[in-house]
């Protein structure tokens, strides 16, 4: 046994290599990931962010002149309230020079002013609070800035040549300061009788010197930052998708094989950390190249982006642990990025206090935006008056980087915590406080192979239903199961999969778990392998408690698990898959390759080791999954149907491998093949409905529930069965005739009468006149035991007859067969609709399918809902912004916004007020008056300063003149928006304080919004926006056909007789109304938010309604065309939706820009369908405002509105042409598309048949004759002539040629009326390919296929096709499937209901009729597919492994149905199978395919006679020690015996006919051997079909074909007849 040591490092490296291979091989996905990132980089590089440095220092400071130089007109002033004081004040204001010719009106209240506003263009409102307090109210966005204050990143000035314009000048130039000065002077004069009007109106204003500064253009820079925030979104989206998908599909299975959590996350983390590094480096280079950050170094920018990207990767990991669905994971990460990143703009605009900012930095997008804001402030600090503090800025940036690092580790910790605490897909979880337990930190590994001597509860005795365990196994109870129950939540009741199951599994034994479909076998194995958690009960495996997570890890460390679903990565080769899982399982690196080669050799997979897993056949995938399970030579093997889908030869290889590993190990497997359990398992455990029913060895079970031995007699043409029966009963009176068929009798002989066999055989040999050709004796089978157990209410009831394998039938089965025949024959009489009535019925059925699917397509509905929400956003934003604008606000003009108070420490942007005295006299009175306003002053008494040279002050007040007559001027820092109004109040209060110290004038600025009458055309952009947006909906609505194509439902419908046009029209019946609902909803919103009482609005809606309907239909059918063309790829609804949106945006832009060019708009509207509706809207706009159309040309644009309907016809015709050229074969003439069933084209086969068997040559001649036969009655129902199929291969390298993969070569056969032909062969031999060519699913490369209809000259209206893959809709119920296919096949509703009920009763599907398919077991799904294939009584049945996954009872039901449908009718069936008993039970003839060639064909008896003339002696020994002595004895008794390579405990010998003649002597010798060696059982009979199959496959060798060819390793050399 290989010593395994699980290493996180080794697992991480293996998974990282796997991820790199995935990125390399799935180039399309990788390209999309990097193209998205590259587009963002290019966008940032070319984006006009408007961010840069401005240097106006060389421009002279600007003098704004006197304040009373304002001379604008066109407005009037309204004030309120009207009092004597306010009236005096405003009269003085009206008398000022600049107010000449301007009205000043006093009104009672502000409402009166509003009424006055309606009749005047502009009114400036003066609202007095008291005599000294008022606010000036201007119309919004008129005469004053819209913002309260300049932000530190705003461009406060711009310069052109020698002219400098600054935002603060608007107060001066637009009259605010002039009006403020006049009102302030009037207040002073009215209240003090001291006039200062001249002093205030003569004030002049200047700008301080403008230092270089970094500017931004507001929203442009914000959007640039927003793009940086989402720059890692493509990476986080794909990491979310990849991690969530792999976590859901494969992680649990890998954990079951020993994977450690850190290795999984590290492998993806390291890969995407590399991606993040490249992206961060590129982003930093782009940002520095466009000079978005000017003073910040490259490494600082790079580190910020790198840490942000890494934190976003960890955030994606966290969300994948919280949100299980991959799409929702990616969407949630994206939405979180947008939300928290957008919220981070509050830090850029300083809306939040610092503690809140650092708290919100726990969300990395917010922390990143905060970091971007801090880097911007490094540049913006140039704008500040405060001295720069580089250390403070660096510390903040370092702190932000630390927060991003902290976020990454926090997300990782939370991810690991929730990964442990939240139940995974298998139900396992730790306790919420698991990290507080010492066992979590100090794990101690228990001894791996300690077996509990004493269990808590002994296995309950159930009478004689359980065989006592041999004493040698006492103390070897390695798996102890106690009272295990498992419940699943269902509707309406819970489903109990296991019920109080108690069982011991022993070391050194192979144990098989048997039971019907849904009995609980897979549930039990899933619980033992950690894939499911029991509802109650306990399980211990080698002293490890399964319910403890630490113990579960110990169990999985020593277990090899083969789950029911195949385990492989499709993008890896077979060898790469094995290497990966070998490393995961902890095999030392130096032994990995050796172990992989061992598995490849033992399972004979070396020839396919370099083939991608996705290209393997079903059997080869199963073999790979089993190979993964046996890697590392585990102590425990838990195998769930390990040989399902394997051919007999591969199945025997698996059996031998398990038998060789039995010693000192535990092997527990489940199977539906009773023969497999009989041969392989030492102990069989039967489970029924979740309860343990019986357990024991084959001999124990057969003795208790078997029927004894079977005597099989092959008869000559002339015989009397009654005489034979009489002879048999003469020797064995208890013998029963259990079956009588054509040329065959089958008797059941009791077990206790074996001693009479020699006498019976002697009598049979001595009576040649009875007409017996040969005979054989075989033991009862486990199939019979199973059916007997399932047919009894309880084990203790009296025994009843059972069905044996092959063609064994009991009387009860004969009755059921007759009942089945009656049921199916009654259904044959049902009338079917045709023509247009059938088309309408099919259309309604497809519409029903689409509607039922839509109910469960949450992604589609959420996507459409999101588009609706985004479409409503402009209306909502417009309304919100209108409400904001309409709400008046008042901003106080306070000196403390800019200037320090006396004694206050410098902080922020506050400075002292600079007063410069140029009067050469004392102005102490004025200075003291200003100081009384609580302002810190710096006085230049000497007057040496200019006031404009030093912008470190926010403002300066310059006093000039002489001692008696002072004049004043202001110098303002251009970055302080309200500087001039604030200085005017300071000056006014300074002058007022000199006269009346206690008084203070307070001016506020305010705005009001005009009640605008919005022209309807101004709302056009909102309508255009949602119309453009809704053009992105169809890919989310109308691409359901891609899913149907992927799950094969499309072809299943087509082969069932569906008209192509009915499929598309049925889809459209749901998709078009859904799309129209989108238009209706958005039109309603548009109407509600608009002004509907306008002529344009009414007419535009009248135009839009028919145009929108046509547009909706045209886009839906355009999407159908796209989905048909791209049906073989991924659905990609999102990509197509984005494409529609971008195309529409650019088309509309071209229409608007090139409208003056004659005809351009018409070409675009016609050639680009998504832009049609918006284009028509723009045309209607120009039509009704009369801007382009002259009188007499009105009809032409109206014809443009019919373009969508022209598109509808074009796309429907295109769809029809695509169906005709590239669609699958149609079974009926389509009444709408006018597509008829195609004449089968004949393609010459390039190969001539060589070295064919004579039976194959005769079949080829028979097929050729049938092709030219004119007799309808004699024509076979299926004719396959010279079929060849080649698949395009792949190039090994760029210079090599593509080598075709040949699946079938020159295969010819026909199926006659009433015949069932079986196709046999190894995995990948070409069986399924042959069926696909006959059904029309795959186009033949060469050859011809003819299918016979029910009437002469007709093709069959539909085929009964049961494909290898279940072509079902997961969310639809069984009954809905049956109703839909019944409608498609033409059954009337009433007849369909009867047919569904009868078929459900016949095949035991009544309890599952209302269950969704996704909740069904694989066996029930398979049964449903079969029922769908026989529904409507098709004339031809194509059955591809129809009974795979079914229990014996289900197999019997299907076999009976097939026989009832085909036998003695004009129907025919072609069947493929790996189950030889199925072929023997059903097939009239079988054909064996090898490497795509037909090697032999004929009846089963003919093949047995030709290739299996010898007798086969099989003996089952109880211990391996008996093998050699028994072999010696057999060779002594039968010297000509040839031992066959069969199975270690099942000894098989080929005996020539002469060696066993007479048979009586042979049985006499064998009875003696049985008693001497205490054999478990023996069988002497002619070769079965499986034995013939294995005999032929013994002498296989490598074919001369290349490895690319299908099943290239198998070349059969048929034994010549004389050698047989």
Curated annotation (Swiss-Prot):
What does it catalyze?
taurocholate(in) + ATP + H2O = taurocholate(out) + ADP + phosphate + H(+); cholesterol(in) + ATP + H2O = cholesterol(out) + ADP + phosphate + H(+)
Keyword hit for Transport: yes
The record's subcellular location field reads: Cell membrane; Basolateral cell membrane
Q: Where is the signal peptide?
A: none
Alphabetical UniProt keywords: ATP-binding, Cell membrane, Glycoprotein, Lipid transport, Membrane, Nucleotide-binding, Repeat, Translocase, Transmembrane, Transmembrane helix, Transport
The source's domain of life comes to Eukaryota
Q: In which tissues is it expressed?
A: Expressed in heart, brain, lung, liver and skeletal muscle. Highly expressed in the liver, and is also abundant in heart and skeletal muscle. Highly expressed in liver.
Chief subcellular location equals membrane
Q: Where is the ABC transporter domain?
A: 479-714, 1283-1516
> Sites of glycosylation?
723
Give GO terms: molecular function aspect only: ABC-type transporter activity; ABC-type xenobiotic transporter activity; ATP binding; ATP hydrolysis activity
Q: Where does ATP 1 bind?
A: 515-522
Q: Which GO terms describe its biological process?
A: cholesterol efflux; cholesterol transport; positive regulation of cholesterol efflux; regulation of cholesterol efflux; sphingomyelin biosynthetic process; xenobiotic transmembrane transport; xenobiotic transport
Is Repeat among this UniProt entry's keywords?
yes
Q: Which residues cross the membrane?
A: 30-50, 223-243, 267-287, 298-318, 326-346, 352-372, 396-416, 860-880, 979-999, 1023-1043, 1069-1089, 1105-1125, 1135-1155, 1164-1184, 1194-1214
Q: Which GO terms describe its cellular component?
A: basolateral plasma membrane; endoplasmic reticulum; mitochondrial inner membrane; plasma membrane
According to its UniProt record, the EC number is 7.6.2.-
Which amino acid positions bind ATP 2, per UniProt?
Answer: 1321-1328
What does it do? Mediates cholesterol and taurocholate efflux. Through the interaction with ABCA1 potentiates the cholesterol efflux to lipid-free APOA1, in turn regulates high-density lipoprotein cholesterol levels.
What does the similarity note say? Belongs to the ABC transporter superfamily. ABCA family.
Tell me the protein's name.
ABC-type organic anion transporter ABCA8B
What is the scientific name of the source organism?
Answer: Mus musculus
